[in-house]
Amino acid sequence: MKNKITLITISVAFLMNFSLNAQTEVTESQVTSAEDLAKQLANPVAALISVPIQNNFDFNVGPLEGFKYSLNIQPVIPISINEKWNMVSRTIIPVISQSDVTALGSNETGLGDIAQSIFFSPKEVKNGLVWGVGPVLLLPTATDNVLGAKKWGVGPNALVLKLQGQWTYGALVNHIWSYAGSGPNDIDASFFQPFATYASKTGASVTIAAENTQDWNNDFFGGFAGIYYAKVLTFGKQMLQLGGGPKVFYGNNPFNPDWGVRANIILLFPK
């Protein structure tokens, strides 16, 4: 536990130091840009190239009350197909380190299964309504059997959201079925993520979101709700968003943590 606390302390200190060394307030000439970027970041299919680097620290995981750290690298790349449509690629590359989760004294570290989502979304926004649909793919890239399902998976992916002044709210859903792979357990799982974000005119934002997964094969439901504060900053010539907040878990999944902390750094590449 001492090592876990030390790890969190170092991570928080790094983020605070990074924020202080960054330009903690955008200049007047950047206010409009910062506000616009904060709003675009709340929209999963915005025409904005970004690279979120998401750190998750989860505590009291499962019956052995273990610890799990997940680093999710999530590049988002929008591609203009024609005058009316965008295609947005969203990839989640998880790097996981956990202890006392599968057995007392156990330690596993490695790559998890990569998830690749594609959204096709109309460029024209009518009445503030934004939507996108496409496929989601699960790739069996885990380097340890306990860090992934070792299954190929595929399914539908969709989102809908409303842009209303400083607010953005909506939901993302998908469903994955496995169809091949060496893993012992088939996948039949639904994911649902409602969210609401308020973006201020200075580039700061507050998001309330929940991430829920229903495992139909095992009749397990698990998820968490979190509230996150974030701020658009500049570091030299690089624009980024820095943020984080607490998470509280719920559901009947026996490997749910009790609580956690999320810290994000998102590199921004506006056109």
Summary of predicted features, one role per range:
Residues 24-271:
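Transmembrane beta-barrel domains of Gram-negative outer membranes and organellar outer membranes
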Residues 18-22:
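Sec/Tat signal peptide C-region and signal peptidase I cleavage site
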Residues 8-17:
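Bacterial N-terminal signal peptides
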Residues 1-8:
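Bacterial N-terminal signal peptides that target proteins for export
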